[in-house]
Amino acid sequence: MAKPTTIKIRLNSSAGTGHFYVTKKNARTMTEKMVIKKYDPVARKHVEYKEGKIK
């Protein structure tokens, strides 16, 4: 069976609230770490989310 091209990643909030999103990314085309601005409901504003490993 072939290895899947998409992997699950965890996007951790940079606001330090402990909130995170789980999403997928294509490991072959996006080799660098993902950084996205998304809404943090704990901080109640848009902050940067940085890629981390799912434990």
From Swiss-Prot:
InterPro entries assigned: Ribosomal_bL33, Ribosomal_bL33_CS, Ribosomal_bL33_sf, Ribosomal_zn-bd
A GO term for molecular function: structural constituent of ribosome
Entry's Gene Ontology BP terms: translation
Keywords: Ribonucleoprotein, Ribosomal protein
Family annotation (Pfam families): Ribosomal_L33
Assigned GO CC terms: cytosolic large ribosomal subunit
Family recorded in the similarity comment: Belongs to the bacterial ribosomal protein bL33 family.
Protein name as catalogued: Large ribosomal subunit protein bL33
Protein source organism: Roseobacter denitrificans (strain ATCC 33942 / OCh 114)
Highest classification ranks of the organism: Bacteria, Pseudomonadati, Pseudomonadota, Alphaproteobacteria, Rhodobacterales
Encoding gene per record: rpmG
